[in-house]
């Protein structure tokens, strides 16, 4: 088990940052934290009312690194990875290997951000990023990002991840990544860490998962401006990511 692991954010792939702004910044009220560009992708993060974060990533300088371009060409836009912050990346890599996972794309060169990934073929259908960083990044918001439409920001309550095997999902997210079980039903388990936002593993949804071992099903938000609900925004209407929006 990776002691001290915490769920930091969910990352969503889009062709351009700007494509995601009307929904995630305007309607849901995500507040800009930081953004930047590097070989292969550009990323920026938005924070919601409870502190939970969404990262939008888009292809950039793909001639140097085309991993995200290939992902979008193969799968379309939508959920890409879950990032877990860890206190010691080398220990986390060793724990992962001991548990039978194969860390890939290990990068320990940057003194401010060290990372490794667990491939979705090893994990239940989602890329898991392990990252060590003591820095809280911030940067000026870019021109053109919309102001929140509503007076209050939504809260990002949970990421709901459909899995073919609940036991397999728990082996990763509890056995390795130290999630604490906070709720359980017949076919799902909800996990929490010491940061905002939760992960709910749901067994089933074979029509959505298809031949995969798992797939992010939706992001659940509480939206104070809703009087009736919940409201479902289907993937085709939100850049490949389903949203469930609940009144609150």
Where are these regions (language model features)?
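Core segments of cupin and vicinal oxygen chelate
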Residues: 2-5, 11-53, 91-114, 118, ...
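Conserved donor-binding loop and adjoining core beta-sheet/short helix segment
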Residues: 34, 52-69, 204-207, 247-248
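A short, polar/proline- and glycine-enriched secondary-structure boundary/capping micro-motif
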Residues: 65-69, 139-142, 181, 211-213
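Vicinal oxygen chelate
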Residues: 1, 6-15, 44-49, 54, 67-155, 184-202, ...
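Generic hydrophobic/packing signal
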Residues: 60, 83-86, 97-100
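Residues that form or immediately flank small-molecule/cofactor binding pockets and catalytic motifs
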Residues: 37, 61, 108, 135, ...
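Anionic group-transfer/hydrolysis microenvironments
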Residues: 11, 57, 83, 121, ...
